[in-house]
Design a protein with these regions (language model features):
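Anion-binding and metal-coordination hotspots
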Residues: 1-221
Length: 221
């Protein structure tokens, strides 16, 4: 079964159970959007529908919009589906899964891009797929800046963003050597507070910006 999410622009909220939301709000359709109906409805969505949706969402983004890249695995019992056949499930090794990739706006939390990939798709292929499709649909330099979690931190992904000309903010694992070297320069006072970092009153966080040199090699050498 599938679940449909509805995003309300006016209220700036999202609801993960549409059938419950229908109890208190008027919707474009009087039909009850239960899980079975949503499953049948989602099966009618074609690749052309998906591409048209992404194209329309990109046009609605303001210049310099901020988007976040994320993914999740979805388990399934289908044995003939290509996306599920090669999926590696982290919770149950005997249950295959697909990889659901999406980009959403950090301002409105509305979806901008989504795609289902095979469960064994690595992060480098994921990022390249996202950038390639969004570029084909009209994404230009500086149209959208990307934020990723530490799972996407690699030189290959940095090179993909750099080649696209897209600004990006990439989280990194604290165990990586460049991160360890930066953290080792932080000094603390007798109370355990950092003395060579800035403090942001709004977020109540300490921060410090450092330059880390890295090399990006073009595909043509």
């Amino acid at each position: 079964a599938s679940t449909m999410a509805i995003y309300t622009v006016v209220e700036n909220r999202s609801f993960y159970r549409l059938d419950r939301w229908q109890d208190t709000h008027k919707t474009p359709s009087d039909h009850r959007f239960g899980s079975d109906y949503v499953t049948r409805l989602s099966q009618t969505i074609t690749e052309n529908h998906r591409m048209e949706f992404i194209k329309a969402r990109l046009k609605r983004q303001p210049k310099g919009a901020k988007g976040s890249v994320d993914s999740t695995t979805r388990s399934g019992y289908g044995k003939c589906l290509v996306d599920l056949k090669w999926g590696k499930n982290k919770d149950r090794d005997d249950l295959p899964c697909s990889l659901e990739v999406y980009v959403y706006s950090l301002t409105t939390h509305e979806p901008i891009y989504y795609k289902r990939l095979a469960g064994n798709t690595n992060d480098m292929v994921t990022i390249r797929t996202i950038l390639t499709e969004m570029k084909e649909l009209g994404l230009k330099e500086d149209d959208l800046s990307f934020t990723t979690d530490r799972g996407y931190c690699s030189k290959e992904n940095m090179g993909a963003f750099h080649k696209m000309g897209a600004p990006f903010l990439m989280c990194a694992k604290v165990g990586q050597i460049p991160v360890i070297q930066c953290l080792s320069t932080i000094c603390y006072d007798e109370f355990g507070l950092p003395v060579n970092m800035e403090y942001d009153k709004e977020t109540k966080l300490y921060y410090r910006q450092m330059d880390i040199p890295y090399t990006v090699q073009k595909e043509d050498g």
